């Protein structure tokens, strides 16, 4: 299969260059400084854990490269409210347009509709995008180890923390652990979907658990219902990033409620 991640990153580099030309770095930094106060993403997750509940990072996603259009009837504010009312800890909103049909407007609409903290879900390759995330109102950013070098990971994490945001560090396998050794974020996501082939296996999370002892592990992709949640919780994983299962449901709130 074509290396999907490299294709996405090449497109992203062109996209960021165009965005910088439209809104220069100085302006985006000023917008970030003026953004609404940050809501604590990590505290919201820990609040669920203190209640002995699974912490669900509920994703707002219209489409994906592997599945195409997932939710034709796509209204971010309504989806966000359904998630909040059903007990989600946080939101994740796709802002990548070419591959996921996302938009910064979706992030803004979702955040304005609820009190939950919101993650910008995108492929961050430049510190400009970290400022951009805060300018749009994001409370957290995703950093993908497979997409970045060690120095980039460390710089982008430091900048996100300087701006008050939580970092969700996404890992996929043992080879990525070494370049993340200096990162301080407690939130470590394990993507059960291989970003190079898009195949899914929950074993990805289980294989990395011993190396992530003491961290708040987020299992991402492939969680389809309560059985998967209970399976992971029995093994010490209590935080779940779930998108497609919810996005395909007629009643999103009811689908989230099935996990509790």
UniProtKB/Swiss-Prot annotation:
GO terms assigned for molecular function: indole-3-glycerol-phosphate synthase activity; phosphoribosylanthranilate isomerase activity
Signal peptide (residue range): none
NCBIfam families: PRK00278.1-6 (NF001373), PRK00278.2-4 (NF001377)
Pathway(s) this gene product operates in, as recorded in its UniProt entry: Amino-acid biosynthesis; L-tryptophan biosynthesis; L-tryptophan from chorismate: step 4/5
Classification via SUPFAM superfamilies: Ribulose-phoshate binding barrel
Name listed for the protein in its UniProt record: Indole-3-glycerol phosphate synthase
Domain of life: Bacteria
BP GO terms, sorted: L-tryptophan biosynthetic process
Native organism: Neisseria gonorrhoeae (strain NCCP11945)
Pfam families in the cross-refs: IGPS (PF00218)
